[in-house]
Structure formats: structure tokens, C-alpha cells
């Protein structure tokens, strides 16, 4: 009877966590790349659209998704199963169905991590503890209110890889599955390998080394071998994709030797969980609290996967923090497994401490859900204003959101990729400004006078008390794109590097002290003007702005 009660408590606790996760995602509309996945993908880009999509061909059924993903494999990257699911929910099904499915995947994620960290015994406390720990200490909000594309690419892919690790562990322990179970396990292994390179590359490399070791000991063969082969075949499908190879070539292209070396050294400083793992390992080993030989033996596979992921990142250099998710996850997983081996950690893993920790997590998550409902209303209000305005102008009020919620909440910003995505999705250029700029922008004509002209810049005017610049370009057409080049006084290399990482895709670095941002002119009272918001650069000394046709 007691055993059944514990089982029901496990189920109820997991369902409660799943419902909380559902509430988070229920307040997130289609965002960012989700909008692009509503259209058919092509083999190459058309016009100025950064994604190779046909804006005149929205997805009209599952058959279109197959064709679109076939093209996507050649033009974008090799994550075909992942993006098939993304496009299915973005274009064929709807966000409500996705919210239910992703909540179930989140439950599988929690169960999978619990099985890896606590292989022998698990209670409801472990599930709520893992949910709380990942909420506070894992660096990526991609697991939470992140939209369809990010959630499937990262959380779903990671969950598939976690369950593959559990299957592989069972196969290595000698468990023999029946034919139907083996067929299902092979399918899961293949799809997990064909999910996301941030996880699959490390696991595939560790599987290869494990298989060679088994071959040397004449222990190769059996179901563990077939699972490893299936996973590696899936990972190979990721790597050999023409889209992936093209992206790797563009990322790995050496523009400047100093920048190439710095990006590979600098990436190490972003691996915070790795340094925490190394530091704690050293401390516990020196203090005699950890049997390092036993720990290394028990976690050989995970350590190999971690090392291969680090090597993979060092070869590529820093791309973005999302690329580090595999390194951070394996480091964090090993850290949790180490704490479980440390006898004194039982005080940290005490049931009452974990429940108290969960209470803080619950209060914070409920507040985030409340704020997300406000940002969702704001999002649709901005869309309505933008569509109703003849010039595509929209204004965003300043919401008083605590800074510690920023990692869980994504809002529109004037220079974000999402503004461009909305422009493509609705077929109308979007121009988003702070609400305080509205009165200025309604009277643009009054600022196109010599009194507001920027010195030494004949066609450039500045609106006082704002970071807005206006350039009149009567000879251009609305579909033209101009590039504004901002020149700054030299800044330290470290600062330049950090700046380069936080700007979105519309901003490009040119020889360390010059930055370019692409803008499109808008029609205003029968003339074309370019409106430049210099807010992103307000902490720098602006020397000049050069307009040139792109």
C-alpha cells in the first residue's frame, strides 16, 4: 500500500510541475523564428529575406512540411526531425496543442535527469528539487517561455538525448529488449542522434570511443552496439547536411587571426558550470571528500561526451551562448552526480531544504506567469498598432519588470530580429519605438530644418533630448536598404568582444571600431526618410554616421 501511495505522489508532483510549465508557455504567442516556419523553405534565399523562405507560399498541410524540410536540410541545417516538428506546430497544428505536448516533454526531461542523477532511488522531492535547481542555476531560458522553435531545438532535443543515455545504460548493463522494444529503442536512438549538434556530437564521440574499447575487449555486438550505431547514424545526418556544412564554413572562416584566437580563448569564460565542476572536483579531492578514481570510473561516458563537446566548441569558436548548452548541461549533470556522492551533501539535499527551495521557485514562477500575461497583452497591442498605422509605426511602453525576470521573459525591442520577422510575416515594414518618442515622430517635418542639422552631416538631423536621428533620402524607394556606419573612439578588446555578442544579427563589426546597422527608409508626407535610433550606442562617443546604399 505504501509503495502505491509513493507512486501516486510521484505522479501528482510531476503533473503539478507540468501544469506550471504549461501555464508559462500558454502566455507566449508565436515569436521570432516561429513566424518564419509558417512558410515554405527553399534551397536558397530570395530577395532580402534572411531565411530561405517563400513569403508567398504559407504551409498548407503536412505534405508541404515534408517538401519544406527537404529544402531546409540543404539550405539551413541538418536538424530535420526537430524542424519538422517545429514547422508542424507553427503552420499545421496550433500553439495550444504545442503547449500540452511540450509540457509532457518537460515531465520526461525531469524524469530523465532524475534517473541519471539518482539511478537507485527517487522520490517526489528529487523531481521538485531538479525543477528548482534548473530554474535558478541553469543559464538558458530556452526551457521555459521560449516559443516553439527554441523549445523543440533545445529542450526536446536534450530530452531525446537523455532518454537515449538511459536506454544505452540499460543495454550495457545486459538488459535484453524484445523485438518491438528493440525497434522502438533503435528509432529513438536514431532520432536522438539526429536532433541537435550541441548534444549529439559529444554523445556520438563518446559512443565511438566506447565501441572501440568494447571491440578491443571482444565485447562488441548485441543491442548496445546497434543502439550506438543508430545514434551515430543520426548524428552523421546532422553533420553531412549541406546546410550545416555551409554554416560551419561561414562560422569557421578566419577573418582576423587575433579575433579567431580570442574567440576560442574567450569562449572558455562562458563555460561557467564547467569551471564550477572543475573547482568543486579539485576542492573535494584535496579535502579527501571525493574518491576521484571512483567518480571518474562511474562517469567515464559523460566525461568523454563533455570533453568532445568542449573540443567541438573550441574548433568553431564562440558563436552564441546557445551553442554552449551541451557543455553546460553535461557539466551541470556531473556536478549534481558529484554532490550525490559527497556524504556531507546530504545536508544540502535534505528533504526540508529542497522543499523550501522549491517554495521560493514556485513563488517566482507564479510571478513570472503573471508578468508573461502582461507582456503577451503588450505584444498583441503592439501588433495591432503596427498593422493599423500607415507607416508601420508602433510604440512600446516601459514595463517595470524586475531584472531577475529578464532571463525568463522576452519582449520586443526596436533593434531585435523579431521586428524583422514580424515585418516579413505581415508583409509590411515594422518600426518600433519607445512610447516616449511618439510625439516627436508625429512631427518629423518640424525637425527637418537647419536648426536640428548635425554638424558636418548635410542630410542628417537629430531630434533633441532623444537618441533619434533622421536622414532625408528623397531619391530612394521604400524597398531600398541603407547601411548606417557608426564610428567610435577605440575601446578595449575585451569590451569590444562582449559588445559584439549582445547585438543581434542586424549589427556587424568592421575592424573593431566601426559598427554597421541596416535600416529601411519609410514614407512620410510624400518623402522618404531614414529614422535611426542610436539608443543601442548611447554609451559610446558617436563621431559620425555615414549613409550608403546597400
Language-model region placement:
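Transmembrane alpha-helices and membrane-interface helical segments
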Residues: 108-115, 163-170, 206-214, 281-291, ...
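Alpha-helical transmembrane segments
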Residues: 7-21, 127-132, 186-187, 228-233
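Intrinsically disordered, polar/acidic, low-complexity terminal segments
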Residues: 6-81, 90-109, 121-122, 363-550
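Membrane-interface micro-motifs in multi-pass membrane enzymes
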Residues: 79, 126-169, 196, 271-279, ...
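Membrane-interfacial loop-to-transmembrane alpha-helix junctions, especially the N-terminal start
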Residues: 8-10, 121-129, 177-182, 220-228, ...
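Membrane-interface transmembrane helices that cradle and orient dolichyl/undecaprenyl
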Residues: 161-182, 216-219
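Transmembrane catalytic cores of multi-pass membrane glycosyltransferases
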Residues: 22-97, 148-152, 189-307, 314-323
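Signature aromatic-anchored transmembrane alpha helix within multi-pass, membrane-resident enzymes
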Residues: 179-182, 303, 341-365
